[in-house]
Regions:
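Short, Lys/Arg-enriched N-terminal segments with co-localized hydrophobic residues
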Residues: 1-7
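Double-stranded beta-helix
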Residues: 8-24, 88-93
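Conserved short histidine dyad/triad with adjacent acidic residue
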Residues: 20-39
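Short, conserved beta-strand element in jelly-roll/cupin
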Residues: 38-53
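Well-ordered beta-strand positions
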Residues: 45-47, 63, 71, 81
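Short acidic-glycine-tyrosine-enriched beta hairpin
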Residues: 58-75
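Ligand-binding loop in jelly-roll beta-barrel domains
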Residues: 73-93
Length: 93
């Protein structure tokens, strides 16, 4: 999926107001799931996950489960690790 700047993203997204829904497909290349940081604080809610994991900088990965809510402070490095099936999340900034 290409963003407005012409960069490829490993997800599809749909924005509704201050909420963004993202879907990462089960066949996402693991090389696309890179360490990154965001400019704003984010609250991520897991809608669908089967073995996908989330990792903050200097912490061990945690398995994402449906209903989990993760607070990610701005400028904090983090990444996701691929599991089975799709990962569906909502992001509130």
């Amino acid at each position: 999926v290409e963003d407005s700047g012409g960069n490829m993203k490993p997800y599809k997204e749909n924005k509704k107001g201050n909420l963004t829904e993202r879907v990462f497909k089960e066949n996402t290349d693991t090389h696309e799931l890179v360490w990154h940081r965001d400019r704003l604080d984010r609250e991520v809610t897991v809608l669908e996950s089967d073995g996908w994991m989330f990792q903050m900088d200097n912490e061990l990965p945690i398995v994402l489960k449906e209903g989990d809510v993760i607070e990610i402070p701005k400028n904090t490095y983090h990444r996701i690790l691929r599991g089975n099936g799709n990962l569906k999340i909502t992001i509130k900034e």
